[in-house]
């Protein structure tokens, strides 16, 4: 949820707009199971084994893209540098990714990378959503929710300069 809020705030959404967006949101409409198992519940679990996720995540990414487009935001180049940083986990290399900064390590132009894709990577709950695959020079890298490796990444904003305090909330039981 933090990545979604951070992205929408960076895109220029106001509190009232965010309230309206999330009030009208029906999460079940963003869950897109693989087409061949829609009517056969048992096969959904086979897909978990085969594709590493119950849901594809394409509808979620499409929803992000549509909402961001209303503010004219499509890729990281549409935002001022440093405005948005998202965290994702590269399971293939056991590394935490800070997006867009670390995309250059995969040979990807940071400014042209879709924010909706980065957001999908950052909130892709393992085994619930299929992972996103990023290609590097050696192989495809499996990328999932940043919370796998760093669930509370306030350190991203610590640049050594004195700034306003950053307020974060961590919910746990």
Locate the predicted segments by residue.
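Patatin-like phospholipase
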Residues: 7-173
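Gly/Ala-rich beta-loop-alpha elbow adjacent to hydrolase catalytic centers
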Residues: 2
């Amino acid at each position: 949820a933090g990545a979604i809020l951070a992205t929408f705030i960076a895109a220029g959404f106001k509190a009232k707009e965010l309230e309206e967006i999330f009030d009208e949101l029906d999460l079940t409409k963003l869950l897109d199971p693989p087409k061949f198992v829609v009517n056969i519940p048992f096969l959904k679990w086979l897909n978990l084994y085969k594709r590493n996720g119950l849901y594809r995540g394409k509808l979620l990414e499409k929803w992000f893209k549509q909402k961001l487009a209303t503010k004219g935001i499509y890729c990281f180049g549409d935002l001022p540098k440093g405005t948005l940083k998202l965290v994702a986990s590269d399971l293939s290399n056991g590394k935490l990714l800070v997006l867009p900064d670390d995309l250059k390590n995969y040979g990807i132009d940071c400014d042209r990378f879709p924010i909706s894709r980065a957001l999908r990577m950052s909130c892709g709950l393992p085994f619930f959503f299929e992972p996103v695959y990023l290609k590097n020079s050696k192989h495809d890298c499996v990328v999932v929710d940043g919370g796998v490796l760093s669930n509370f990444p306030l350190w991203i904003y610590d640049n050594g300069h004195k700034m306003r305090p950053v307020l974060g909330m961590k919910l746990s039981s």
